[in-house]
Regions:
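A short, N-terminal "cap"/entry segment at the start of jelly-roll beta-barrel domains
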Residues: 1-54
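Conserved short histidine dyad/triad with adjacent acidic residue
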Residues: 42-43, 58-72
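A short beta-strand-loop-beta hairpin characteristic of the jelly-roll/cupin
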Residues: 76-102
C-alpha cells in the first residue's frame, strides 16, 4: 500500500507545469501530479502514484491574481476547492464566470475552454480530477494574452 500513499507535505510540485508559467498572472502557481501523469508539459514533474486508477488526480496552488489561461481538454475535468476563493471562467471568449470557495465543486465538460484564477488574498489550493487513465491532450488558447518578447521571458 505504500506505493498508493501520497502525503501532501511530501509532494513535489512543478512551478512551471505549462509554458504560460513564464507570463505574469501565471508565474506564482504550483502544479502537483498525485495519481496518474495528468496533462502538465513539465516532463520532469514527479508523479507520486503512477498505477492506473481510471482517473488522474492533481492539485493546483496559486498566489492571488495567478491561475491558468484558457484551455480545454479531451477529457472531463473536475475542480474541488480546498481553500481560498477562485474565479472560474469559460467559453471561447472566457466571458462566462463564477466564484467558488472551499467545498465548492465544478465539472467542466470535454473540449470546452476554461480557466481559473485565485481571487482571494492568500495562497489557495484546489484538487483537480481528469477522467480516464489517459488524461488526453490539452489545447491552450493564447488569444487573451499579451505575449512577451524574448527579452521579457
Amino acid at each position: 500500500m505504500i506505493d498508493r500513499l501520497a502525503k501532501f507535505n511530501e509532494l513535489v510540485p512543478s512551478s512551471l507545469p505549462f509554458v504560460e508559467g513564464r507570463l505574469e498572472g501565471h508565474k506564482e502557481r504550483k502544479n502537483y501530479t498525485i495519481i496518474g501523469r495528468g496533462v502538465a508539459e513539465d516532463t520532469k514533474q514527479l508523479i507520486k502514484i503512477q498505477s492506473l486508477h481510471g482517473y488522474n488526480l492533481g492539485a493546483v496552488s496559486a498566489m492571488p491574481k495567478n491561475g491558468s489561461g484558457l484551455h480545454s481538454h479531451t477529457t472531463a475535468e473536475v475542480f474541488v476547492i480546498y481553500s481560498g476563493k477562485w474565479r472560474f471562467y469559460w467559453g471561447a471568449d472566457g466571458k462566462q464566470e463564477t466564484i467558488l470557495e472551499a467545498g465548492d465543486i465544478i465539472s467542466m465538460p470535454t473540449n470546452m475552454f476554461r480557466a481559473f484564477e485565485n481571487v482571494g488574498d492568500k495562497e489557495s489550493l484546489m484538487f483537480v480530477v481528469l477522467g480516464g487513465d489517459d488524461p488526453g491532450i490539452i489545447t491552450v488558447s493564447y488569444t487573451h494574452l499579451t505575449l512577451p518578447t524574448n527579452r521579457e521571458v
